[in-house]
């Protein structure tokens, strides 16, 4: 996931409720005294009938007036905080409709393998050097976790137009497991040590909905794992950071979402342990924004039914279920109804990608969700 610095100021209150108030709709006599009033910059309402406003008033965590400065200032009381935007833009916060907040924290704390301008990795030698530099700069963390993680490479932007391999990662370390996460998070690359830890070998069969790529002319894994093959490996490797490490990922991920203007972050396809971790952090007051988890519809239905909620408690809720049907278009595993046009890599003619769930699983999940009101 690539990000760009955002210079806008974002309201973190419940912005969707009264943005529809048009200019001049603030009451002439204050029915409520505002806690805060913003003015002094462009205010975008996202309301087609009144796209811009001069001021916004908030009371009790809710927007109570949007309109002209003269009208909104009528809600000013002796303790109202006046906030001068100084030309900055004010707009409603973004709601994450498809994200993985723990993966965001993982990205923030891992070696940055993104291509320019977000990183410096344009070929595999640069990727390997970035890993070496990160290991040297984070020796204490590597020694503690016995795990090296890099995030954000994309074979389509590498000069070689391919994924790195286990043998190349072995030049960094043969003794400490290494896990690279593709920019889409649907692929990964493991070194030989990591492959051994997760139990993948020439005898391993591809899991349903995933692929273990092999060395040419053999069944030996070359380190590249697709979709559910990678997900299974990652779930076995990441616990090496310990529960405190996973908590750090969650906190840092939520902070990243907050910095870029989100008021709701998502943890998609969460497992129950992840959902419990997020609830624990929420109960401890760790989040400044709302976090919603959607749990795997194929494996954890009883947990979903028992724990889903339409309301947030301490800024967290389990919102329902997620069903993964196919992969990622970035890695050419997304399932298409027509062949990919010039996919980057070694793919057979007419390649369509592939599903990660059967038709029976999809229809059964839909029926279950409707019956359980998920």
Which residue stretches match the model-derived regions?
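Intrinsically disordered, low-complexity segments enriched in polar/charged small residues
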Residues: 7-9, 143-144
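Acidic (Asp/Glu)-rich catalytic clusters
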Residues: 281-285, 307-316
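Positively charged n-region of N-terminal signal peptides that target proteins for export
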Residues: 1-4
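Bacterial N-terminal signal peptides
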Residues: 8-20
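Divalent metal-binding segments
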Residues: 22-39, 44, 48-304, 323-374
